[in-house]
C-alpha cells in the first residue's frame, strides 16, 4: 500500500513539474486575484499600432479597468498568438484541428483585429463582435485587371473577383486571417507566393508594390488605411469573402472572463465610448458596414 501511494505521489509530482513550465489559462477570478490582465496583441493596422495605442489597446485597457485590474500588453504575432494564449500549438489537418505540445501561457486574451473563423472557434471562445471586416483582392494601380462593378449578390461578386486572379500570382500569408485556404483559393491553379520575410501583415502592400506578386489580400480596415497611405498606387479589385466579424478571443476555460467582457462591450456601446474609439481609429468605416454599426454588431 505504501509503495502504491508513494508512486501516486511521485507521478503527481512529475505531472506538476511538467505543467509548471506551461502556465494554466486563467478565468476571471484568477485574473482578479492576480490583479493584472495580460493582453496578447499583434501589430496590425490601427488595432495595435505599435506606438502604445490602437483600437484594441484602448478597448482592453478599458476592460481591465472595468474588472478592477491593471493592464499589461504582451506583443505576439499571428503565428504564435493562439499558442501564447492556450499553451499549445494549433495544428490543422483539413477540417480537423488539434492542440499539440506544451508551452508557457503568456496572455489571457487576444485582441488585435482577430477574425472569427470556423477553425479557430473549435479551440477558442469568442466575444460578441467588436468590429466588422471583409477580405478584398488588391492589385497595383497599373494592373490591367479592372475592379468589378459589384452587384446586390455578394456570392456573384466573390466569384467574379476570384476569376480575375486566373493563374496570376497572389501574395499570401498562411495561418493568418488572410490564409488563402480560408477563401477557397488553394488548388485553383493560382500562383500562391508565401510572404515569409516577416510576420507583420502590414508589409504586404510594400511587397506588392515591390513586384513580389500581382495581387494580395487585405481586409477592409487595413485597406482603408493603405489606400490613404499609398494613394494612387493600389486599387481594390473586389471581395473574396462575405462580411466577417472581428472579436476578442479567450481560452475555452475562461467563460466568465468572456461574459465580463461582453457585459463591458455592451456598456461602452450604450454610453458612446465604443463609437468614440471607432471614430478615433477608423473614421469613415461606418459607410462600409452601416448595418453592423446601426444594429450594435
Name each region found by the language model.
Residues 57-66, 139-169, 245-285:
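Extended ligand-binding regions for polar small-molecule ligands
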Residues 22-25:
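Boundary at the C-terminal end of the N-terminal hydrophobic targeting segment
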Residues 42-43, 130-138, 144-145, 203, ...:
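Periplasmic-binding protein-like
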Residues 8-20:
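Bacterial N-terminal signal peptides
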